[in-house]
Amino acid sequence: MSIPVFGLGTFRLQDQIVIDSVSQALTLGYRAIDTAQIYENEAPVGQAIQESGINRDELFITTKIWIANLSKDKLIPSLRESIQKLKTDYVDLTLIHWPSPNDEVSVAEFMSELLKAKGLGLTRQIGISNFTIDLMKQAIAAVGAEEIATNQIELSPLLQNRNVVDFAKQNGIAVTSYMTLAYGKALAEPVIKTIAEQHGATPAQVILSWAMQLGYGVIPSSTKAANLASNLLAQKLCLNAADMALIATLDRNERLVSPDGLAPKWD
């Protein structure tokens, strides 16, 4: 099994806004949807999916276990609740959203429990998010690298996270990029704008294409149908080696997501 290269993110979208975003995306041809327990939008996401009438086996639904639900007694019940909210019988991928702060719950405990959830048929694949190299090593020790479908991390032209990417690749763990556009900051980079002009593309398409050509999955979000459609077309854009080399020079380790009390010690 593998994970989709392109999907729809739903972070910060709630209620009717997320219903509209997911509905529009599905109509346009999106088939992978990324949500999380902490987004508090699993139910409206599920509603939009249900109302679309698209066969479940055509869809790839990802959710993430929040830190309050990492312990052995809470993880599987919380995932069952997520599945119920999503109005489905299973999810395709379940991630540990963040490692447990201060190791309150050990990596071995929550990864073993997540693997058990897979064994129960609640999730087809399992993975991790916001994991450093050390945390990936612990996860691999707990369940084996072959069980970890992806590490979903903040990754953009401004934060290329090469050490984490290299370690993941060496262990056969796919990388999914979130915040690929760096909250829009990367769109304003002159290098990105120039490449976009040369290809008759948008800056967002250039960045998404860059990430996909490096082998990363992407999950951009939008509430606008035009942007949803435009982002989807990034899959058809092919950047050349010179373009890729120029974007590589933009890396400045500029991390935008590092919540106090939640973020691990980054590589």
From Swiss-Prot:
NCBIfam families: PRK11172.1
Organism of provenance: Yersinia pestis
Localisation: Cytoplasm
This protein's name: Methylglyoxal reductase DkgB
Binding site for substrate: H97
Enzyme Commission numbers on file: 1.1.1.-
Gene: dkgB
GO annotation (BP), single: L-ascorbic acid biosynthetic process
InterPro entries the UniProt entry points to: AKR, Aldo/ket_reductase_CS, NADP_OxRdtase_dom, NADP_OxRdtase_dom_sf
Family indicated by similarity: Belongs to the aldo/keto reductase family.
SUPFAM superfamilies: NAD(P)-linked oxidoreductase (SSF51430)
Keyword set includes NADP: yes
An example Gene Ontology molecular-function term: methylglyoxal reductase (NADPH) (acetol producing) activity
Keyword Cell inner membrane among UniProt keywords: no
Major site of localization recorded for this protein: cytoplasm
Recorded GO CC terms: cytoplasm
